[in-house]
Swiss-Prot record:
Residues 28-194 are extracellular. A zinc finger (RING-type) spans 264-305. GO terms for biological process: apoptotic process; programmed cell death; protein ubiquitination; ubiquitin-dependent protein catabolic process. The modification Phosphoserine is found at residue 341. It catalyses: S-ubiquitinyl-[E2 ubiquitin-conjugating enzyme]-L-cysteine + [acceptor protein]-L-lysine = [E2 ubiquitin-conjugating enzyme]-L-cysteine + N(6)-ubiquitinyl-[acceptor protein]-L-lysine. This is E3 ubiquitin-protein ligase RNF130. Glycans are attached at residues 29, 40, 112, 135, 172, 189. GO terms for molecular function: ubiquitin protein ligase activity; ubiquitin-protein transferase activity; zinc ion binding. Pfam families: PA (PF02225), zf-RING_2 (PF13639). Residues 105-176 form the PA domain. It is a single-pass type I membrane protein. Its EC number is 2.3.2.27.
Length: 419
């Protein structure tokens, strides 16, 4: 496997960490400190001697708002062309301010335009403060961003409280409001507990991953060593068995020279005078130069699959199938020229046929195109191992990135919003 191919997963892991580090975190905005606002509301209903009062503890000063106390009557925008205007975004937004009112506070709903536009429009009509209520019932107030609005105080409250106040104003009931500075809330930075959690989680993940990889490669090494020992044992046994097999030289008049006699099943050539042949225990005959490499690897007859080790009593309990596959590429390279020549002669000679060899259970020799997948299979195996290693690295990087984002992410209540 090439170095570039190995570097591919590593580049993915590096890219994952880079993406994590460049994540457009809203936590940077959320890390801004903010101040809570304590709001007391007094409602004077007609015909009621004692005014109704309630307190709002979940208000929040805007980021660019002065943190100061203010008091005044609450007013909502007048309808525009008969349509209620709760947002304060329209250029025609107006407020009816009674002549006896010196300080008043605008009540507006969030949405449709930026906080800066709403606050600036209320300030244009001389409001001393703006209270903006949320437009989503289940959301807490956020820290509003409204640079350039001057000295006007801006506070956000929940939708529920805002609509409660608005309901009184729509009935022409006087509502007085006092806004006081509450608690300063420090930035919500990466807490020590989160850091410990991320560190422990990542260490545990890496330990598990490393243990799995160590176990995997130990097993692989053990398997490889056992296979190599078995191969050496079989190789030694095969050499010993080959030395005990009968070898003779074909002479004139021997049955092997008969045209009807089976050809050598390995090289598919007929036997000629002075050829050295090997006679196996099953009585099958092959060229010595052809069958010896085969027996060294397979220790079985190429035709009937007889185990020569068992037949000769050398290794009776060790099957030849434990050995690795015979390297046909090496054999065919040594016999390539002769085999192709023999195949050409057999194709041109109608008196000779390959049918007896086929019926004898001989597996056809692979062609050159069939040998190339062996290298491809090796590459696939190596690629698979590197993929397993790289997968754990990539998974660890992504997990660490996810945990960091989760640990640093703040609640919606700590977000800074522009509109």
């Amino acid at each position: 496997m090439s170095g570039a191919a190995r570097a591919g997963p590593a580049r993915l892991a590096a890219l994952a960490l880079l993406t994590c580090s460049l994540w457009p975190t809203r936590a940077d905005n959320a890390s801004q400190e903010y101040y809570t606002a304590l709001i007391n509301v007094t409602v004077q209903e007609p015909g009621r001697g004692t005014p109704l009062t309630f307190r709002i503890d979940r208000g929040r000063y805007g980021l660019d708002s002065p943190k100061a106390e203010v008091r005044g009557q609450v007013l909502a925008p007048l309808p525009i062309h008969g349509v209620a205007d709760h947002l304060g975004c329209d250029p025609q937004t107006r407020f009816f301010v009674p002549p006896n009112i010196k300080q008043w506070i605008a009540l507006l709903q969030r949405g449709n335009c930026t906080f800066k536009e709403k606050i600036s429009r209320a300030a244009f009509h001389n409001a001393v403060a703006v209270v903006i209520y949320n437009n989503k019932s289940k959301e807490e107030p956020v820290t509003m961003t409204h640079p350039g609005t001057g000295d006007i105080i801006a506070v956000m409250i929940t939708e529920l409280r805002g609509k409660d106040i608005l309901s009184y104003l729509e009935k022409n009931i006087s509502v007085q409001m006092t806004i006081a500075v509450g608690t300063r809330m420090p930035p919500k930075n990466f807490s020590r507990g989160s850091l410990v959690f991320v560190s422990i989680s990542f260490i545990v993940l890496m330990i598990i991953s490393s243990a799995w990889l160590i176990f995997y490669f130990i097993q692989k090494i053990r398997y490889t060593n056992a296979r190599d020992r078995n191969q050496r044992r079989l190789g030694d046994a095969a050499k010993k068995a080959i030395s005990k097999l009968t070898t003779r030289t074909v002479k004139k008049g021997d049955k092997e020279t008969d045209p009807d006699f089976d050809h050598c099943a390995v090289c598919i050539e007929s036997y000629k005078q002075n050829d050295v042949v090997r006679v196996l225990p099953c009585k099958h005959v092959f060229h010595k130069s052809c069958v010896d490499p085969w027996l060294s690897e397979h220790c079985t007859c190429p035709m009937c699959k007889l185990n020569i080790l068992k037949a000769l009593g050398i290794v009776p309990n060790l099957p030849c199938t434990d050995n690795v596959a015979f390297d046909m590429e090496r054999l065919t390279r040594t016999q390539a020229v002769n085999r192709r020549s023999a195949l050409g002669d057999l194709a041109n000679d109608s008196s000779l046929g390959l049918e007896p060899l086929r019926t004898s259970g001989i597996s056809p020799l692979p062609q050159d195109g069939e040998l190339t997948p062996r290298t491809g299979e090796i590459n696939i195996a190596v690629t698979k191992e590197w993929f397993i290693i790289a997968s754990f690295g990539l998974l660890s990087a992504l997990t660490l990135c996810y945990m960091i984002i989760r640990a640093t992410a703040s609640l919606n209540a700590n977000e800074v919003e522009w509109f």
